[in-house]
Curated annotation (Swiss-Prot):
Function: Produces ATP from ADP in the presence of a proton gradient across the membrane. The catalytic sites are hosted primarily by the beta subunits.
Membrane disposition: Peripheral membrane protein
Protein name: ATP synthase subunit beta
NCBIfam families according to UniProt: atpD
Gene3D superfamilies, sorted: 2.40.10.170, Bovine Mitochondrial F1-atpase, Atp Synthase Beta Chain, Chain D, domain 3, P-loop containing nucleotide triphosphate hydrolases
Subcellular location: Cell inner membrane
Binding annotation for ATP: 147-154
PROSITE patterns: ATPASE_ALPHA_BETA
Record keywords: ATP synthesis, ATP-binding, Cell inner membrane, Cell membrane, CF(1), Hydrogen ion transport, Ion transport, Membrane, Nucleotide-binding, Translocase, Transport
Gene behind the chain: atpD
Subunit (UniProt): F-type ATPases have 2 components, CF(1) - the catalytic core - and CF(0) - the membrane proton channel. CF(1) has five subunits: alpha(3), beta(3), gamma(1), delta(1), epsilon(1). CF(0) has three main subunits: a(1), b(2) and c(9-12). The alpha and beta chains form an alternating ring which encloses part of the gamma chain. CF(1) is attached to CF(0) by a central stalk formed by the gamma and epsilon chains, while a peripheral stalk is formed by the delta and b chains.
Length: 457
């Protein structure tokens, strides 16, 4: 191991001087004698390297001895990480003892080559009606979950983890990037109570941690997911929140001496996002499907950060405060959410027609709402009255009780297969259920439960 010494400290950025013949490579991990890990970002010449600190730089001083590990940051991978909470370095932070991993992988890896990649037209059934119908997920696809505070991003994520774990016996990796510590704690206990903790690896870099941790924690989680994929599994990789990954990069960029670009973001924004997103892909052995929560600063979708994220996504699930205020959960906006998979060649003609039919009726209802508000229902034509009645049933039928929310709702969760989802909505569009009151469609699973509920009304 070659050794150097600290020559300059500026916040989270540390300069270290090494002998000329033993300069560390970019991305090598260095260990300070105080136990802090640094990651090399630039070589400045004269044996000096500029690093970011993966931990607080409090108490460091010039002249401290630094050793080169000659490797990038190595984190534990494999099934031993399931059910554990780790930090950016893969160290356990759940007070449950050592991880006991059999293997460690470097967090900086190249994306799979073209030959290894497989095209993903196979759908991943989530059991959530509105998602499977309107914005279906592809196996190995990337999904953006857009929403403000309190509309249900985290609950949707937890339900997806639960459904994949129980129904598909798949593994999930959750990377909390710049998370609130309280949310991370809630998430852990929810997973524990839902009995799916043994199928999830949790990696946290909270809001109060230095920017180096928040910048790298997404790569730590991704490395764990890649290991599961290479073992031939279909993995779900959750990132909450991808915006804070960008923000951490912005924080260290100026300290590293780079000129800021538009809106003060780092000039390497597109490259940093690309490096992360290109590794999230399916190979011939397995798939990584990612669900990323996206915070939109000041609701401006043209902001460089969400705009860069958009370029990588296959599906966008937009959660709407207006729908949540009606008590319809999951509060997914069926007119705003999109998916590249919603194509007759991928999902089949029937699914496509039903999804477009549902959107058409809801759009027409949206237009009629103004007339109803002023003149009332009686002034509508018979045809429009029928549209409104069916639209209200569809709106309610898009709601669904979640397994992870049983504690709050008091109703047992439901998993609905894609076949049942299409059958139910097709029936409503065709007028088969025009005689059933709309209350029967609220918070149920399949259409058979609607008929059962209607009998008891």
């Amino acid at each position: 191991m070659s050794a150097g010494k600290i020559v300059q400290i500026i916040g989270a950025v540390i300069d270290v001087e090494f002998p000329q013949d033993a300069v560390p490579k970019v991305y090598d991990a260095l260990k300070v004698e105080s136990g802090l890990t640094l990651e090399v970002q630039q070589q400045l010449g004269g044996g000096v390297v500029r690093c970011i600190a993966l931990g607080t730089s409090d108490g460091l001083k010039r002249g401290l001895k630094v050793e080169n590990t000659n490797n990038p940051i190595q984190v534990p991978v494999g099934t031993k990480t399931l059910g554990r909470i780790m930090n950016v370095l893969g160290e356990p932070i759940d007070e449950q003892g050592a991880i006991g991993e059999e293997e460690r992988w470097a967090i900086h890896r190249s994306a799979p080559s073209y030959e290894e990649q497989s095209n993903s037209t196979e759908l991943l059934e989530t059991g959530i009606k509105v998602i499977d119908l309107i914005c279906p997920f592809a196996k190995g696809g990337k999904v953006g979950l857009f929403g403000g505070a309190g509309v249900g991003k985290t609950v949707n994520m937890m339900e997806l983890i639960r459904n994949i774990a129980i129904e598909h016996s798949g593994y999930s990796v959750f990377a909390g990037v710049g998370e609130r510590t309280r949310e991370g704690n809630d998430f852990y206990h929810e997973m524990k109570d839902s009995n799916v903790l043994d199928k999830v690896s949790l990696v946290y870099g909270q809001m109060n941690e230095p920017p180096g941790n928040r910048l790298r924690v997404a790569l730590t989680g991704l490395t764990m997911a890649e290991k599961f994929r290479d073992e031939g599994r279909d993995v779900l990789f959750f990132v909450d929140n991808i915006y804070r990954y960008t923000l951490a990069g912005t924080e260290v960029s100026a300290l590293l001496g780079r000129m800021p670009s538009a809106v003060g973001y780092q000039p390497t924004l597109a490259e940093e996002m690309g490096v992360l997103q290109e590794r999230i892909t399916s190979t011939k052995t397995g798939s990584i499907t990612s669900v990323q929560a996206v915070y939109v600063p000041a609701d401006d979708l043209t902001d460089p950060s969400p705009a860069t994220t958009f370029a990588h996504l296959d599906s966008t699930v937009v959660l709407s405060r207006q729908i949540a205020s009606l008590g319809i959960y999951p509060a997914v906006d069926p007119l705003d959410s999109t998916s590249r998979q919603l194509d007759p060649l991928v999902v089949g003609q029937e699914h496509y027609d039903v999804a477009r039919g549902v959107q058409g009726i809801l759009q027409r209802y949206k237009e009629l709402k103004d007339i109803i508000a002023i003149l009332g229902m009686d002034e509508l034509s018979e045809e429009d009255k029928l549209v409104v009645a069916r639209a209200r049933k569809i709106e309610r039928f898009l709601s669904q009780p979640f397994f992870v929310a049983e504690v709050f709702t008091g109703s047992p969760g439901k998993y609905v297969t894609l076949k049942d989802t299409i059958r139910g909505f097709k029936g409503i569009l065709d007028g088969e259920y025009d005689h059933i009151p709309e209350q029967a469609f609220y918070m149920v699973g399949s259409i058979d439960e609607v008929l059962e509920k209607a009998k008891n009304m």
